[in-house]
Amino acid sequence: MSGDDLDERIETYYVRVRGVVQGVGFRHATVREAHALKLRGWVANLDDGSVEAMLQGSAPQIDRMLAWLRHGPPAAHVTEVTFEEHRTDKRFERFQQH
């Protein structure tokens, strides 16, 4: 990707997902979904049992990923998804699991 026009359309969001989201393949499924949507960023487990993610892409890509995160993979039981825009000049190269 190159050009200022394209960069202006890239958004970055920090997301927290709570519920039964660890030990159910949530991160792996999140990586698969992010790759399908051509998102960049990462996903990781937190000590409190929740999952965090950094999503980077266009507004429609982010919206579709947030919609998917609200239910996650079949074994998950999502009770809450919170997100906020994260202003950064950093550009992730791919989406990965931590």
Swiss-Prot record:
Enzyme class: hydrolase
Residue intervals of the Acylphosphatase-like domain: 12-98
GO molecular function ontology, one term from the record: acylphosphatase activity
E.C. code: 3.6.1.7
Keyword Hydrolase: yes
Pfam families in the record: Acylphosphatase
Gene3D superfamilies (UniProt xref): 3.30.70.100
Active site: R27, N45
Classification via InterPro entries: Acylphosphatase, Acylphosphatase-like_dom, Acylphosphatase-like_dom_sf, Acylphosphatase_CS
Keyword terms of this UniProt record: Hydrolase
Catalytic function, reaction form: an acyl phosphate + H2O = a carboxylate + phosphate + H(+)
Family under the similarity heading: Belongs to the acylphosphatase family.
Stated name of the protein: Acylphosphatase
Taxonomy of the source species: Bacteria, Pseudomonadati, Pseudomonadota, Betaproteobacteria, Burkholderiales
